[in-house]
Amino acid sequence: MNSQSKALVTLQKEEEVSLITLNDESSFNSLSENLLKELFAVLKESDQDVTTKVLVLKGVGRGFSAGHNLKEVQENQNDDFYRDLLNSCKEVMTFLSNLSKPVIAEVHGVATAAGCQLVASCDLAYADSDTRFATPGVNIGLFCHTPLVPVSRTIAKKHSMEMLLLGDLIDATEAKRFGLINDVFEPEELHKKVMEVAKTICSKSSYVLKMGKETFYKQLDMELEEAYEYATERMIENLKAEDAREGIDAFLTKRNPNWKNS
């Protein structure tokens, strides 16, 4: 991107929260290859920022994201472009779970196809009551093969298949019922509520948040016995940490903890 180009992704700080905004309103914040590359760079920057404890991901304009840029796809009909685009998308989506800090999606308008994939890939997600979600690729002869990866790992099989096979829009209340998002708020309340959640998380130990997120995602693919063995070792490691000793002492003495690793 040259100095004259508009940033497709912007980054602002609000205390210990990094606000990451998809900034391509003219395309409904479509996940073009360039936007995905910028998003990955900003996510890495925020992950490495020791003053950031939580990331909030949102979009400008009329919607969160309408998914991949179909005009760009239509203009680049070759395997190399398809692979580069989808690999850039995979890089972002997998990094969201590998990232050491919690990521919250603040969703409005629409989140469709790869935009819905992005919501499903975040740790938490909140939407306003006007938001609509879909994996509508089937309607244009292009099944949502890559979006289904996090969607099917976030919501139940029958709900996933219903979204994928019908391609219909669902409202925010239905998305909450499916488990795609955590809660629904009125449009004028959404950002305030998301920041309340973010700041509550910020009050916790950075060390514990990082360790807990890592444990959660690593154990998901393990067999039950293996998961318990892994989680037991992580619990022992956590119990020996300075912040655990501080937190337990604060609880027992009825005072607020003073985290050492925050």
Set out the residue ranges of the language-model regions.
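Conserved CoA-thioester-binding segment of acyl-CoA-metabolizing enzymes
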Residues: 1-60, 94
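Crotonase-fold acyl-CoA enzyme core
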Residues: 95-207, 241, 246-249, 255
